[in-house]
Amino acid sequence: MKFILYVLASLVLFGLSVLLSLYSSANVYSATVMISQSPVHITIGLNVCLCLFFAIANALKTLLFGSLQTFELELLYEQFWITLTEIMLAITVFREAISISFFMLLSTLMFARVFHSICSFRTERLQIQLTDQRFHIFSRLTCAYFVLSILDASLIYLCFTSEHLGDKSTRMLFVCEFSVLLLNLTIEASKLCIYLYEARHLDQVWDEKSTYLFRLEVCRDGLRLLAYSLLFMYQFPYVSVPIYSIRQMYTCFYSLFRRIREHARFRQATRDMNAMYPTATEEQLTNSDRTCTICREEMFHPDHPPENTDEMEPLPRGLDMTPKRLPCGHILHFHCLRNWLERQQTCPICRRSVIGNQSSPTGIPASPNVRATQIATQVPNPQNTPTTTAVPGITNSSNQGDPQASTFNGVPNANSSGFAAHTQDLSSVIPRRIALRDGWTMLPIPGTRRIPTYSQSTSTTNPSATPTTGDPSNSTYGGPQTFPNSGNNPNFNRGIAGIVPPGWRLVSSNTQSLSTNSAMTSLYQNASSADNNLGSSLPNVVPLSRGLTQSNETSNTFPAASSNISSQLRELHTKIDELRETVSNFRADYNSIRTSLNQLEAASGINERIQTTSADSLLNSNGMSGTEGFENTQTSITTNDNQSSILTSSDQTSPFATDEDRQNSRNVQLETVDENF
């Protein structure tokens, strides 16, 4: 309504200016001369021409497209700034050729771009379902393609033949632009034909549609790049720096490169989808949401179809609705996943890449498999060699083809340690020289050195040899290595470092230890035959019920490390005996002082209160595995009217215990020792 009022006001103002010129002039010729020479009359005339141009364009838009929707207006507004930048560059380059004809061609080019953009929006948005409601839209869109193609061809011919529109360089600019618009219109019409063909064959799925669409887009970008390259070569003799052509060439080249790269990633992600994305089991579907995130339909395993199949609509031919599991653990339909991968090669839920073993993006919560990956990355693969053995810890041996199909304690896709596991995440980090039996896995021991390196020059007869840090090639990463007491037997290294590396422990899903488990003891037969003393050096094995809590257990150490620990324990026991003797002396002195105070108070009859507080306990009886400790003891001596009383309070146990209370084993653990005491 506002635009109509603006057009009417412009026409009325232009009519008044013409009447005023005729009234003040003797004849029509003099009135025409006055209008052409007066700046006010020229401005009013240009305003009327612009209003008429906008009115014609608006009428053509209403005729071809009808009313625009909100999202179309937003997209046009976004493209307006790009078009405005290109116009400014064109005016800067061709500032000498600026004229009324130049502005008319430039305005026509702007509106032609708007119409072509609307056609592109409608084509991409159009769902080719030829019902009675959509047939009118489809016919109007076809008419718009026909009218715009005639308009583009006419303007190209006009710019080629009409010399009064400007010099050759300016006309070639508009020829190139209208040719690119005609090319875009042809590509969009071809895509519309592809959509129409797909709509005519709804009873089957056309998987090759994405390939044809990609070829059309590549042809579009390639021909655009060729057109602007020819324009650059033609304008170079006339324009010193053809900035406009350079920008268009860069845009086309980047679009072509990005499209080819995305298609290559799509081909990589969909090369063998049945092998890359295993079929989700019925148990995994039960433990997760059965609704597909893309189509919002319920997913079913092929072996467990829905019960009410008669009420459901028949699926088109070739439509694969098999639930596929991504590396991140999310499940989607096969067909929905393929359509999604055409646009993005990431999970639609967590945005994790589906190509390769890539980590989660920053700021996005990790999937359950990431926890298992973080644990497994602490174990190096000694030789980084592929293996065909089962993944350690998979509890369901019948699903070796799909390592993710097992569960443990209600956790989907979990190994025996309770963490979710994935073959691609664990195969390159966990040492897999030997296969672990079902119900066993390896967990790291926090706070321990893993995979220590022993020097080549270490004597095999020296039991106190200490581990040294050397070249990784001389460690259990795969290089040669000499261990204490190994002799010349080659099975020693394989028995220790080849099965369970130092700093790790075996964890079982039952309460049976390694020494009584015949299934796991067979793994160490070769190692046990290498050395008679090897049985005492077997890795630390704990049940699963204690595996996650015993983080401070002693790790699998070599004889040299065991010797150092024994010497440290002997020194610790010596210090404990010295502390006990000091405590005994302190107790005797304390008793003598207390007796003297009682005698002094009874003799002198002085009313005073003496309050003494003993020192804090030196050792905590709970932390010393049977060794008593001092508790907070407070003694109050109160004397009132020649009467004294001694109040002694203790938390649990008096520090002055008898010898029987102090009897305990040598298995102690020192947590805190005050050396200044």
From Swiss-Prot:
Region annotation (Disordered) ranges: 379-404, 447-488, 620-677
Pathway where this protein functions: Protein modification; protein ubiquitination
Biased composition (Low complexity): 379-392, 455-469
Keywords, sorted A to Z: Endoplasmic reticulum, Membrane, Metal-binding, Phosphoprotein, Transferase, Transmembrane, Transmembrane helix, Ubl conjugation pathway, Zinc, Zinc-finger
Enzyme class per UniProt: transferase
Topology, Lumenal side: 24-39, 108-140, 193-225
Comp. bias intervals (Polar residues): 394-404, 470-488, 620-656
Topology of this chain in the membrane: Multi-pass membrane protein
A molecular function (GO) term: ubiquitin protein ligase activity
Topology, Cytoplasmic side: 1-2, 61-86, 162-171, 247-677
Zinc fingers typed RING-type, residue spans: 292-351
Transmembrane stretches, start-end: 3-23, 40-60, 87-107, 141-161, 172-192, 226-246
UniProt xrefs under PROSITE patterns: ZF_RING_2
EC number: 2.3.2.27
Coiled coil segments of this chain: none
PTM annotation (Phosphoserine): residues: 367
Family: Belongs to the HRD1 family.
Record-given protein name: ERAD-associated E3 ubiquitin-protein ligase hrd1
Protein source organism: Schizosaccharomyces pombe (strain 972 / ATCC 24843)
